[in-house]
Regions:
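Extended alpha-helical, oligomerization-prone segments that build pores/tubes and scaffolds
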Residues: 1-177
């Protein structure tokens, strides 16, 4: 989906001192079909109650999440202390020719977009806006790794929606893909 990203542009002043310029720019990315898990009962994104995206991250990439909004620094460090937890799936050997990553240990980080009980949000000390208190479920974005909830936030999009688009090669009225 589209997100804002702060990008650093190299810049030097008249004295030769490095003074980078930071601009917020839109970012869009693709997700491999192997890392995208939509609602199993949905046949398209409009019907999906949730999606899960799997991220394979290095220790450095996981630590970089601490600089992004609403990520819980101490829980990220706890997840790192537990060690890399990614295990290669059976079908990934078939994709080895397309592998752009080095064969080093990784963390499996799961990103969830979808509905969740308000009770759970209150247990996580998430402040529920007054106008949303009447609902039993709300749309959220949750990141987890090694059993740690790295990020739990209400869906920031207005209206709340899952920020993914899926384009199947052929439409099948009985299946997502």
């Amino acid at each position: 989906g589209p997100f804002a990203l702060d990008k650093e542009y190299p810049n030097w002043d008249d004295e030769g001192e490095y003074t980078p310029i930071f601009k917020t720019i839109p970012q869009i990315d693709h997700v491999s079909v192997w890392d995208f898990y939509p609602d199993a009962d949905a046949t398209n994104m409009e019907q999906a109650q949730y999606i899960i995206q799997r991220h394979k991250m290095s220790r450095t990439e996981l630590r970089a999440l601490k600089r992004r909004p609403y990520f819980r620094e101490s829980l990220i460090e706890d997840a790192i202390e537990q060690g890399e937890n990614y295990t290669k799936k059976y079908w990934e050997d078939d994709l080895i020719d397309y592998n752009t990553e080095n064969e080093i240990d990784r963390f499996e980080v799961l990103e969830y977009w979808g509905m969740i009980d308000v009770e759970f949000l209150e247990d996580q000390a998430i402040e529920i806006p007054k106008e949303l208190k009447k609902y039993d479920e709300l749309q959220v974005n949750v990141w987890c790794c090694n059993g740690k909830l790295l990020r739990v936030v209400l869906n920031p999009f207005k209206p709340a929606r899952i920020p993914y688009m899926a384009s199947p090669y052929e439409l099948n009225p009985y299946s997502f893909f």
